[in-house]
Amino acid sequence: MVSPLAVKGGEALRTRPWPAWPQPAPGVPAAVAEVLGSGRWSISGPYRGTDSHERRFARAFADYHGVPYCVPAASGTAGLMLALEACGVGAGDEVIVPGLSWVASGSTVLGVNAVPVFCDVDPDTLCVSPEAVEALITERTRAVVVVHLYSAVADMDGLTRVAERHGLPLVEDCAQAHGASYRGVKVGALATAGTFSMQHSKVLTSGEGGAVITRDADLARRVEHLRADGRCLSDGPPAPGAMELVETGELMGSNRCLSEFQAAILTEQLTLLDEQNRTRRANAARLDGLLGELGLRPQATSEGTTSRTYYTYAARLPEGALEDVPLTDVTGALTAELGFPVQPCYAPIPANRLYAPQTRRRYTLGPDHEARIDPKRFALPVCEDTARRTVTLHHAALLGDAEDMADIAAAFAKVLRHGADLAT
């Protein structure tokens, strides 16, 4: 008998298209055309008598978060490295980071010659807990990075208390949380610094890009120097044709600047963010109910969360269901039914094939350092269990309607009902 599952030759549950991503804001074409004809395509281009798009976006993004300072950057990875260095992290220092995240949470720490210390996560929120972080603090700890993962906001009250008790800077990685808030404050504005990614898949995107926000003027100035080869923006307008960047020599940096094209796109895309987030939240709530009826456990968020941002919708499979089926087979079956990618949760960073410091000569800094950055030394049981049982959907699916959410639930029901077929 032929299985009804599409992955086994049956008929797919859905063939209609899903919402596309990215979705350009109405003002994007004109903004890009303006840059194209401006004669200034980067922050280091000649001043043309008006504010750069980079400055305009920095102001808009800072205002959106209620903070005085935003420094745009080339990527989220660049932003994290800039924030860490601006906080004083350097050679041999330890930085506590989540064990369940994209590999950049570890590689950025390596990139500033420091040592990532991977922390296990809370089984419900999938974010680091204050208790787990505090247990890892040593005399070599120099900073803590918290990732607001998928759709959750971490326990910022508890994490802030831990960081303050030990005199450590706390960096929020908000690459997956643009627009989320905690006790009425936007994430990124709750700690020493907040970093963001504007890579293609993010809810605020310019293809690639990033930013660092902060309330600390000195830290913002250090970030400026670090991202522009040791230069910072001038206080006033320069002469026409000159650069707005001043060579102060205060702090050596490198080039991690955002282009004018990207900044122009981001300023326009920011006008859509809240509306799109509202749509995602409403559809996620529908999906929570529908999948909960099937026994799945949607990702939770911390108690202080005011509003969530759904970069990814994550849910744990029902206990006892499909336990003998590889998770990639389950997600493959769901993808075949929906015509939309359903993915396994992130692998724990130390087990991720993309996290391989031993393949880079720049990290061979002596036996002690190499032992400290060896991924094999970390035991992360909750991360490992989560990776075996949690599936995810990209936020584009949440820009649909109630009928789309019903289709997602129907696909899960079908795969759960015929799960035995996946084991053959």
Curated annotation (Swiss-Prot):
Catalytic activity annotation: 2-deoxy-L-scyllo-inosose + L-glutamine = 2-deoxy-scyllo-inosamine + 2-oxoglutaramate; 3-amino-2,3-dideoxy-scyllo-inosose + L-glutamine = 2-deoxystreptamine + 2-oxoglutaramate
Organism of origin: Streptomyces fradiae
Annotated pathway: Metabolic intermediate biosynthesis; 2-deoxystreptamine biosynthesis; 2-deoxystreptamine from D-glucose 6-phosphate: step 2/4; Metabolic intermediate biosynthesis; 2-deoxystreptamine biosynthesis; 2-deoxystreptamine from D-glucose 6-phosphate: step 4/4; Antibiotic biosynthesis; neomycin biosynthesis
The organism's place on the tree of life at top rank: Bacteria
Protein name per UniProt: L-glutamine:2-deoxy-scyllo-inosose aminotransferase
Gene Ontology BP annotations: antibiotic biosynthetic process; polysaccharide biosynthetic process
InterPro entries, per the entry: DegT/StrS_aminotransferase, PyrdxlP-dep_Trfase, PyrdxlP-dep_Trfase_major, PyrdxlP-dep_Trfase_small
Function, in words: Catalyzes the PLP-dependent transamination of 2-deoxy-scyllo-inosose (2-DOI) to form 2-deoxy-scyllo-inosamine (2-DOIA) using L-glutamine as the amino donor. Also catalyzes the transamination of 3-amino-2,3-dideoxy-scyllo-inosose (keto-2-DOIA) into 2-deoxystreptamine (2-DOS).
Disulfide linkage: none
Homology family: Belongs to the DegT/DnrJ/EryC1 family. L-glutamine:2-deoxy-scyllo-inosose/scyllo-inosose aminotransferase subfamily.
Modified residues (N6-(pyridoxal phosphate)lysine): 202
Cofactor(s) of this protein: pyridoxal 5'-phosphate
Gene designation: neoB
GO molecular function: pyridoxal phosphate binding; transaminase activity
Enzyme Commission designation: 2.6.1.100, 2.6.1.101
Pfam families: DegT_DnrJ_EryC1
Keywords associated with the record: Aminotransferase, Antibiotic biosynthesis, Pyridoxal phosphate, Transferase
